[in-house]
């Protein structure tokens, strides 16, 4: 299980707290380290096993980063684990490796004077860097993608975060042409759409989220 806190829809803040208990007592999220904050789909909440922690102390501070990574337009095919004999082909967003570093305040609310975000795309507020270098590891590791988190990929990602005790994102690593450890293989299979019904049912019963 992982502890998460719903923020302004559709965002959720995940914390670096993993437990085998479905409902740990007296969780104070103010004292926890943030794993990552991201936008999620209703599908993720519907299929994940979610438990409400009624006695938890929420952190209502607006501490989440307003810097994000936005993928390029278009799409492309990538091959993970090349030369391993067990390669996995995936279609991902972005017509070339990398992405844009952008500013996007997740707490922003439309007003009559400003009904959409400032950037012409309407997706974010402004561009900070139009092409993040593929070697800019500090930037790549620090900031989240602007896309939506879905089931079951996000659940597998959270499991990997528990293994590495930090935020990791196999999909983002694919975007930036990074080599992937073997532990990421199931996540990459999910991205590729190559998992079967048996895998899906196992995932449905295995991954749980506490909010």
Task: Kindly give the residue locations of the regions a language model identified.
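Structured alpha/beta reader/binder surfaces that contact nucleic acids or chromatin modification marks
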Residues: 1, 13-23, 46, 53-62
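Short beta-strand-centered aromatic/proline hotspots
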Residues: 2-10
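Surface loops and adjacent helix of pleckstrin homology
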Residues: 6-7, 17, 105-106
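Short solvent-exposed strand/turn elements
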Residues: 13-41
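Long, low-complexity intrinsically disordered regions
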Residues: 36-107
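A eukaryote-biased signal for long
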Residues: 82-211
